[in-house]
């Protein structure tokens, strides 16, 4: 099983993730796009990195907004994998 990060580790890693928040042992970000098509194009760009990492975000699409949530379900909270995927997602335009 993957090791959970400590509260201190979570706080330190969250500092370098612009736009992400930590709530209830989950990382969240909401990205807003011009329209639905751009939102879907962004979501499609998440597929390859998530598959490569073997770590998949929860995604909610509402017209031009995409809410992404990361947590390691089998570990019951945040792990390094969540922050690694968040860093990758942050680089996708």
Swiss-Prot record:
GO molecular function annotations of the record: 4-alpha-hydroxytetrahydrobiopterin dehydratase activity
Keyword annotations for this protein?
Lyase
Group of enzyme by EC:
lyase
Gene Ontology BP annotations = tetrahydrobiopterin biosynthetic process
Q: Which InterPro entries match?
A: PCD_sf, Pterin_deHydtase
Q: Name the Enzyme Commission number(s) assigned to this protein.
A: 4.2.1.96
Which Pfam families does the entry mention?
A: Pterin_4a
Q: Which reaction does it catalyse?
A: (4aS,6R)-4a-hydroxy-L-erythro-5,6,7,8-tetrahydrobiopterin = (6R)-L-erythro-6,7-dihydrobiopterin + H2O
Superkingdom per UniProt: Bacteria
Q: What NCBIfam families is this protein classified in?
A: PRK00823.1-2 (NF002017)
Q: Give the family from UniProt.
A: Belongs to the pterin-4-alpha-carbinolamine dehydratase family.
The protein, known as:
Putative pterin-4-alpha-carbinolamine dehydratase
Q: Which organism was this protein described from?
A: Nostoc punctiforme (strain ATCC 29133 / PCC 73102)
Taxonomic lineage? Bacteria, Bacillati, Cyanobacteriota, Cyanophyceae, Nostocales
């Amino acid at each position: 099983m993957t090791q959970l990060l400590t509260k201190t580790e979570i706080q330190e890693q969250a500092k370098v993730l612009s736009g992400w928040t930590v709530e209830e042992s989950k990382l969240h970000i909401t990205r807003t796009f011009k329209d639905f098509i751009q939102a879907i194009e962004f979501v499609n760009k998440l597929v390859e990195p998530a598959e490569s990492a073997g770590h998949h975000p929860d995604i909610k699409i509402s017209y031009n907004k995409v809410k992404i949530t990361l947590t390691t379900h089998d570990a019951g909270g945040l792990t390094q994998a969540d922050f690694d995927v968040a860093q990758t997602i942050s680089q996708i335009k």
